[in-house]
Amino acid sequence: MAEYDLTTKIAHFLDRHLVFPLLEFLSVKEIYNEKELLHGKLDLLSETNMVDFAMDVHKNLFPEKEIPATLREKRITVVGQLKQLQGETEPIVKMFEDPETTKQMQSTRDGQALFNYLAEKHSFRQEYLDTLYRYAKFQYECGNYSGAAEYLYFFRVLVPATDRNALNSLWGKLASEILMQNWEAAMEDLTRLRETIDNNSVSSPLQSLQQRTWLIHWSLFVFFNHPKGRDNIIELFLYQPQYLNAIQTMCPHILRYLTTAVITNKDVRKRRQVLKDLVKVIQQESYTYKDPITEFVECLYVNFDFDSAQKKLRECESVLVNDFFLVACLEDFIENARLFIFETFCRIHQCISISMLADKLNMTPEEAERWIVNLIRNARLDAKIDSKLGHVVMGNNAVSPYQQVIEKTKSLSFRSQMLAMNIEKKMAHASRNETPNWAGQETGF
């Protein structure tokens, strides 16, 4: 379903290495012509040192042609550079392999103290840090992400936050962990990178906006694979004003992922409050971005149009199954979305016959009653069943005055944030083309 595919938009904010998994996914889904995807891969590979991979793609794309001489020559050059960097880095790596050094690294959090220790014990010098960084980056460009992550870790613990390569090394470490699918380590690196960006007083507002936009896109890999990711994405994208502002200003298409995270959230009570805040954002941004997932929420919670909501839900299935980040959320999304339709319908009507519900849910009355009983039993639905009359009666929990004040205060706070963001949004004329230094090139196909 190419109409709703966001790969080209998302790839614009990713390092080129992170785009490869998306292209592999599209290839399996057969959304685009395979030759177009192979051309895209070859274009991405042209700026990396993954020459063997490029040769394989070239063979698949042009089976009748010889491998270009430029690729063969590049391979020789890359191998030569790798050997040279290995020779320069080997003595440095041996220092880190020393048991005493390992113990010192584990016991101290002070990079300067560790640097002084290495200088005293192993004659470590400042230029070694640049060598280590160059070697890590070269390993990354060759597709050796485990090596890159290891050397970037050594680099990170030694350099101060003011080092010219400090921020770039955090981007590289995060990318490496993502590409190795080490989600715990990636979550730690994501948190560290976010703190660095948020606490950076040197960057201009425009640079910070661009960095946050990149972080938002890279975080999708982590949030939709880490066990706590769907909670964290809501907290970051919806309730951190600077990141919500970045989404509204630079990348409203991210609302698809925020909406999916809210709908599939397992905390029922939290989800209801979050939905209210999400609906406000979706309404506000509906003129800049909409797809079946955001429209489903709008149909159900703004227009209370149940027929349109059912129609959009069917479209959501196609969107989810063809989205690299959301395909694993399909079952949770459909189950919870049906529950939302059912719950909203019942809340409007307060009392409804089971036979009517069965008809709406395409079930027999007995199946519908069992389904509702399970929802009540699992505390996912506040309702009672009158078996004699064959009715479902929705609960009407009284809200304390204190809770009402809290909710109204939250609402006022949220509206204030939105107002401030709209002012910033009108003032911001950010370029969407700048990339983190680690990537060095725009990506896309």
From Swiss-Prot:
Component of the eukaryotic translation initiation factor 3 (eIF-3) complex, which is composed of 13 subunits: eif3a, eif3b, eif3c, eif3d, eif3e, eif3f, eif3g, eif3h, eif3i, eif3j, eif3k, eif3l and eif3m. It holds the Pfam family eIF3_N. Its main location: cytoplasm. The gene is eif3e. This is Eukaryotic translation initiation factor 3 subunit E. It is found in: Cytoplasm; Nucleus. Belongs to the eIF-3 subunit E family. Signal peptide: none annotated. One of its GO terms (biological process) is translational initiation. Keywords: Cytoplasm, Initiation factor, Nucleus, Protein biosynthesis. The lineage of its organism: Eukaryota, Metazoa, Chordata, Craniata, Vertebrata. It comes from Salmo salar.
